[in-house]
Design a protein with these regions (language model features):
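An active-site-proximal beta-strand-loop segment
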Residues: 315-328
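N-terminal accessory segments
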Residues: 1-69
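Conserved small/polar residues in nucleotide/adenosyl-binding loops
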Residues: 335-341
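Signature of the SF2 helicase/ATPase Hel1-core->accessory helical subdomain module
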Residues: 176-247
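Conserved P-loop
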Residues: 74-76, 81-127
Length: 345
């Protein structure tokens, strides 16, 4: 059947094709405005999608709707942690809400400014402007501090940096600890004190917090916040997502599209058990062991201890990966015969 298109002037066909392409793009742009994963694929075409990215995207969608207010994501290095949490997330949310005030923090000011610069440059790009009609103020575009034309603000700071006088609708904390911090209980405590005395107090009513980090130690920021949650019913209630590099049940990679099993096993073989379990499996343990700790053992001094026939020990370790597990218990008992009655004691 003759379509009749051969009678349409070529310039009209080109205009029609352009309109179709534009309509298709607008449909994708609208989808990207409402779905984080769609947005990621539009602004980052080379993105290698993994199962954990879908889980994170679902959490970020809930964050955008206000259904989720407190989120902790623990994940291994080189698994798109910062790209998702400190680059794509703030740019997406700022596009959806150009009046949003975002505070971005990480373990150094230099890295925080790098995140700010990268996010700012994305929002100034043609690709981004095709999705969101948001402009940045020409007189406020420093890497660590910039504003939208509609009153939104982005402020970046390193752990320990001054945040006084700043308000935040969204607080993003990306890896608050460095490698050196993991070796220093004082540094871990400092990061927690800075969080509670600084950024946490800058949050606006109804604001949200996202902590996305690699685990380093039992007393890192994740560990301290979860213990505080367990102790105080009024404390922040966190939704926690843990991503081990190798799945415990199968020993297969979390992100097989990018990480081969043999590559992860090579990393494992190059690290101490403690570093591998903390940083790559999100299961930090103390240097004294995970189940039975040295400081739990006590010497029982008893004069004239009789000859013992049997010594019995029982252990209820309450072993769990959770920071809020029940206490472990250890008991020691014994039996011996008393003479001349041969009564068991």
């Amino acid at each position: 059947m003759d379509s009749g298109l051969e009678y349409v002037p070529e310039e009209h066909l080109k205009k029609f094709a352009t309109l179709l392409d534009r309509a298709s793009f607008l449909g994708k742009a609208e989808a990207a405005q409402n779905d984080f994963m769609t947005y990621c694929k539009m602004v980052w075409p080379e993105f290698v999608n993994g199962r954990h990215h879908g889980i994170m995207a679902e959490k970020f969608n809930r964050l955008a709707t206000g259904d989720l207010k407190r989120l902790i994501v623990n994940m291994p290095p080189r698994h798109t942690k910062s790209e998702f949490g400190s680059y794509l997330l703030p740019s997406w949310l700022m596009g959806k809400r150009p009046t949003l005030k975002i505070m971005q923090t990480t373990h150094t000011a230099e890295l925080a400014f790098r995140f700010g610069r990268k996010t700012r440059n994305l929002m100034n790009s043609q690709e981004y402007r095709g999705i969101f009609d948001v402009e940045l103020r020409a007189d406020s575009q420093a890497a660590g501090r910039w504003e939208t034309s509609k009153g939104g603000e982005y402020f970046a700071a390193g752990v320990g940096g001054a945040v006084t006088g700043r308000g935040a609708d969204l607080l993003i904390i990306d890896d608050p600890h460095s490698e050196q911090d993991a070796l220093s209980p004082t540094a871990l405590e400092h990061a927690y004190e800075w969080y509670t005395s600084g950024p946490r107090q800058r949050l606006q009513p109804g604001g949200s917090i996202v902590i996305i980090m690699t685990r380093w130690a039992e007393n890192d920021l994740t560990g301290k916040l979860l213990r505080q949650q367990a102790r105080d019913v009024l404390a922040d209630k966190w939704e926690v997502v843990e991503f081990p590099a190798l799945m415990p049940e199968t020993n297969k990679p979390l992100w097989p599209e990018y990480w081969k099993q043999e590559d992860l096993l090579a990393v494992k073989g190059s690290l101490s058990v403690g570093k591998w379990e903390a940083q790559w499996q999100q299961n930090p343990t103390s240097e004294g062991a995970a189940i039975l700790k040295r400081e739990w053992w006590q010497e029982w001094k008893k004069e004239d201890l009789p000859n013992l026939d049997y010594v019995m020990q029982s252990y209820d370790t309450a072993y769990s990966k959770k920071e809020t597990a029940d206490y472990s218990a250890i008991t020691v008992s014994y039996t011996h015969l008393t003479l001349p009655t041969k009564r068991i004691v």
